[in-house]
């Protein structure tokens, strides 16, 4: 039998002073440093070089292995260099440095605010688009999402479980995202269900977020 944790443990005091503050758009910086290891697994491999012009949404690095993720530019401008930078953990990591110029976006990006609720893609096409987009989880590991959606052939998923539990006592971004973008999240859940070919999903929300619990209970169809 697997060992389990005994009942108890440490529950740090919550510090949610930023709760219920609206999400705001950050100002465009003069320079951007985009790490190539923003996820668990192998770092992404750069596909741009010094002097290349990039736009918002330009793919600048491709996955470096099966457990890896593509990376896209979040700014427009010119690649200044590819070098190492000391990250928040104190380790030198490879990164792409960009001198920001303007706010040009890739033409393939749909910037309209209309929410498309119907997905006509196959499960395989959905997984490929997720991989191409470099989507990763919001947890500390930033696990590449396409890997989660590709279980071994001998195993079949029974349901989708959405972990909407904030993983540390100061974090409030997930809570606010759930409140401001509930409809988009529910559409995303339905797309994930199609990707793994199941008809059931569960969303786990902490009991310290009664507003989110009420909101998603009202939006979720029940069997």
What do these predicted ranges mean?
Residues 86-143, 154, 210:
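Acidic low-complexity segments
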Residues 77-79:
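Conserved hydrophobic positions within beta-strands
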Residues 63-73, 91:
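Short, Lys/Arg- and Gly-enriched loop/turn segments at beta-strand edges
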